[in-house]
Amino acid sequence: KSFQIIFLITCTNNVNISTCLESISKNNHSLNCLILLLLQNNVKLSLESYITPYTSIKVLHKTHTIPLSQARNILLKSERIHAGSFYMFPDDDSVFDQHFFEFFTKIITGNTLIAVKGTQSKSVYFLKMPERKWALISDFDKAISVNMVIKGTTIQKVGNFDEKLGVGNYYGAGEDNDYFLRCNAIEQFVFSNDLWNYHPLPCKNTLQTVSKILIRYKSYGRGVVYMLLKHRMITEAAKVVVKGYLGCIKKLMMLNWKMAYVYLIAGSVRFYTFLKNIK
């Protein structure tokens, strides 16, 4: 069976995944869709209610949590890449509406970066695309897993995610940006705000402990700087380092001692990563 769109989703718990699957199943009345789902940590789900004439589901299992890029690569390897299909990598808390499926074939003709709206407030954008048509290398920061629609022919050529990058690794970010750059080198992405999905808006740092914020910022900084240097984007990597220190200065001026400390440490981690990996 051929599919028009294939979703590759990894899941480490069953908190949000049911809502994600339900949004696809209930709103898809037009596309031949396959959901490839990797359940980790012995997560168990009843999937029968999500299978429809338009939506098929294939499930793989892991008894423990593995890094995100490795998990996605397992899904990529599990299924022959369908040349005529489009692929997406939603998070387990992504949500889709009927508009997405109804207008997909009218809007998507090649590699595309779509908009992402906030789940909590659907008029607020989590990520809005520029009005210009073509994505450039410098648009790497506008590419995240949930908004990339990628042709099967492109994925055939690009292959796997870089398993040094992403959640669960020392370089804990940048895997989506890296994949975007590699795909964009084969077929240039276009921007579209006419198609979207939904994602929870970011949590405010005031609601998190310093230790949790630090872990996130350090991991992000290492990943993004490493990714940019991998692609020889030295100026962009240097800008990421500088932004860390500028963030510290800004928070000091606001007398926000907690976040000033976080940005100071994060900036230093970025600087160390820059020096360690520049060639």
What does each model-identified segment do?
Residues 62-79:
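Glycine-rich, basic loop-to-helix element that forms the pyrophosphate-binding segment
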Residues 190-201, 213:
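Catalytic beta-strand/loop signature of glycosyltransferases that borders the donor
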Residues 84-95:
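Short beta-strand-to-loop acidic/aromatic patch adjacent to the donor-nucleotide binding site
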Residues 95-128:
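Conserved donor NDP-sugar-binding/catalytic core segment of glycosyltransferases
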Residues 160, 166-178:
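Acidic donor-binding loop at a coil-to-helix junction in glycosyltransferase catalytic cores
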Residues 212-223, 229-279:
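Non-catalytic, C-terminal membrane-associated alpha-helical segments of glycosyltransferases
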Residues 11-28:
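Short, well-formed alpha-helical segments that are part of the catalytic scaffolds
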